[in-house]
């Protein structure tokens, strides 16, 4: 069986474990048509554009 050569220090263990609990940041890009914040590679919910194309009409 595989056995670790050396004991992992408490500092190293806690440092590795802390990454699990870190809050994830959401990537946000700007719509080229209206300038509203939107998720990347998705249709803008404010104006209905994806890139330079109108994908759907937004009900106002």
From Swiss-Prot:
Keywords: Ribonucleoprotein, Ribosomal protein. One of its GO terms (cellular component) is large ribosomal subunit. GO terms for biological process: translation. GO terms for molecular function: structural constituent of ribosome. The keyword Ribosomal protein applies. Belongs to the bacterial ribosomal protein bL32 family. PANTHER family: 50S RIBOSOMAL PROTEIN L32, LARGE RIBOSOMAL SUBUNIT PROTEIN BL32. This is Large ribosomal subunit protein bL32. The gene is rpmF.
């Amino acid at each position: 069986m595989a056995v670790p050569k050396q004991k992992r220090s408490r500092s190293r263990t806690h440092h590795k474990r802390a990454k699990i609990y870190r809050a994830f940041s959401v990537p946000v890009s700007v719509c080229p048509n209206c300038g509203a914040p939107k998720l990347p590679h998705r249709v803008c919910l404010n104006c209905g554009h994806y890139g330079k194309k109108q994908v759907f009409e937004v009900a106002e």
